[in-house]
C-alpha cells in the first residue's frame, strides 16, 4: 500500500521443527502430511486475502531442505555463541524444565531465513509478534556477520494482543477465530467481532480495518455516548468479515444474524441453519410425527409435560419459526429444512437444534 513489496514466509521446514517461543513445554512434532497441508492452506489463504500481484510468497524449504548437517555447523553454527543463545528469553524460560536441541536451534533456522531473504530478495525488515524478538535479532546479527555491519537489516515486533480483562487474544486462550471458513464460518466470524467489549472495539478498529482516523474517532464517540447501539462493533464486524470472506460472506452472515434475532428462519438454508446454530443446544428425534408436548419432553427441551403445556399455551414455543399455541399440534420433522432438522425456539432467542434421525 505504501510502495513496499512484502514477502510472506511459509515455514515448510521450521513448521516441522516447532518454534519454542511463548511455550513452557516441548511441541508435539507434526507429521510430514500435516506440515504439507498447513503449507498449502496458508498459501491459499494469503492469496485469497491479498491477491497474487502485491506480494511474494516464499517457503523456507527452498533453502533449508538443501542444507546438510556439516554445512549447517560450519557455515552457521560457528557464528552463534551458546551463551548468547541461552540468554535469549525464549530459551532462558525453558532451561529449568528442559528444552530439546531441536527447539534450541530453532532460532538459528529463523536467522538463516532472514539472511537468505535479505541477501537474495533484498528484504530489509522482518515483522513478527513480540515473542519473536530473539529470533529476529538473531537474524540481524547473522546478516551483519556475513554481509557486513553496514548491511541494512531491521526488526519490528508487534505486541501480543490482550483483551480489556487482561487475557490473551488468540487460540491458546480459547475462543479463537480462524481465516478458514471450514474452521470458523462467516457467521461465527461476524459474531465474534460484533460481540467485542466496548473497551476493546476502538483498538480493534485501528488494528484490523482500513477506516480513516476520522471514521474511527466518530465511532469511538458513538460508543461512549450510545454504547447500546453498538455502532463500532457492527462496523468492525462488517469490515473484517468482508475483508476475509468477501461481500457474499458478509451478506450471508448478516442474513443469518437477522433471521435468528427476529425468529424469521423459514428462508434459511440447511447450511445456514448449521452455521447459525452450530453452538446452540442440540437434541435428536425420530422422523415420525409427534405431539408437540411429547416432542418437547422427549428432546429434553422441557422438563415435564406440565411445563411443556404451559409454555405452549402461553405462546413461548416456536417450531421452525412459527409460534404454536395448541397442545394438540403435531411436529412434522419432514416439513422444513429438508427433513434434517426441527428448530425449536423457547422465548425470545433460546434455540435448540433437533437433528432428525
Where are these regions (language model features)?
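Short, hinge-like loop/turn segments at secondary-structure boundaries
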Residues: 24-28, 74-77, 173
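Short acidic, glycine/serine/threonine-rich loops at helix termini
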Residues: 18-22, 67-73, 167-170
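A charged helix-plus-loop insertion that forms the helical arch/lid used to bind
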Residues: 20-36
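Gly/lys/ser-thr-rich phosphate-binding loops in alpha/beta enzymes
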Residues: 1-8, 14, 44, 158-161, ...
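Divalent-metal (Mg2+/Mn2+/Ca2+)-assisted nucleotide/phosphate chemistry catalytic cores
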Residues: 31-32, 38-39, 43, 47-163
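N-terminal catalytic cores of NTP/NDP-binding nucleotidyl/phosphoryl-transfer enzymes
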Residues: 1-19, 126-133
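Short connector loops/turns at beta-strand edges and beta->alpha or beta->beta junctions
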Residues: 11-15, 111-114, 163, 182
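Conserved nucleotide- and phosphate/pyrophosphate-binding catalytic cores
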Residues: 143, 147-357
Amino acid at each position: 500500500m505504501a510502495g513496499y513489496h512484502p514477502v510472506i514466509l511459509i515455514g515448510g521446514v521450521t513448521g516441522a521443527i516447532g518454534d519454542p517461543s511463548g511455550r513452557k513445554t516441548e511441541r508435539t512434532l507434526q507429521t510430514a502430511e500435516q506440515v504439507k497441508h498447513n503449507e498449502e492452506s496458508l498459501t491459499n489463504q494469503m492469496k485469497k486475502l491479498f491477491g497474487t500481484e502485491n506480494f511474494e510468497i516464499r517457503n523456507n524449504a527452498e533453502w533449508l531442505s538443501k542444507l546438510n548437517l556439516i554445512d549447517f555447523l560450519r557455515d552457521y553454527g560457528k557464528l552463534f555463541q551458546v551463551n548468547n543463545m541461552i540468554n535469549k528469553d525464549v530459551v532462558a524460560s525453558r532451561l529449568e524444565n528442559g528444552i530439546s536441541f531441536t527447539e534450541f536451534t530453532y532460532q538459528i533456522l529463523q536467522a538463516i531465513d532472514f539472511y537468505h531473504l535479505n541477501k537474495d530478495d533484498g528484504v530489509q525488515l522482518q515483522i513478527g509478534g513480540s515473542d519473536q524478538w530473539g529470533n529476529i535479532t538473531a537474524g540481524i546479527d547473522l546478516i551483519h556477520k556475513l554481509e557486513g555491519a553496514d548491511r541494512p537489516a531491521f526488526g519490528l515486533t508487534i505486541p501480543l494482543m490482550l483483551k480489556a480483562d487482561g487475557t490473551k487474544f488468540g487460540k491458546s486462550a480459547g475462543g479463537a477465530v480462524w481465516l478458514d471458513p471450514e474452521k470458523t464460518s462467516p457467521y461465527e466470524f461476524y459474531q465474534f467481532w460484533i460481540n467485542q467489549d466496548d473497551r476493546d472495539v476502538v483498538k480493534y478498529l485501528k488494528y484490523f480495518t482500513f477506516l480513516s482516523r476520522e471514521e474511527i474517532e466518530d465511532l469511538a464517540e458513538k460508543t461512549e455516548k450510545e454504547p447500546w447501539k453498538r455502532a463500532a462493533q457492527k462496523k468492525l464486524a462488517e469490515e473484517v468479515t468482508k475483508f476475509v470472506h468477501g461481500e457474499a460472506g458478509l451478506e450471508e452472515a448478516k442474513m443469518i444474524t437477522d433471521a435468528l434475532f427476529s425468529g424469521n428462519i423459514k428462508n434459511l438454508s440447511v447450511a445456514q441453519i448449521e452455521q447459525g446454530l452450530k453452538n446452540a443446544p442440540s437434541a435428536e428425534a425420530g422422523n415420525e410425527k409427534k405431539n408437540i408436548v411429547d416432542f418437547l419432553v422427549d428432546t429434553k427441551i422441557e422438563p415435564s409435560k406440565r411445563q411443556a403445556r404451559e409454555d405452549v399455551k402461553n405462546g413461548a414455543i416456536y417450531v421452525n419459526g412459527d409460534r404454536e399455541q395448541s397442545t394438540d399440534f403435531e411436529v412434522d420433522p419432514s416439513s422444513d429444512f429438508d427433513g434434517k432438522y426441527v428448530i425449536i425456539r423457547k422465548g425470545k432467542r433460546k434455540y435448540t437444534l433437533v437433528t432428525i434421525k
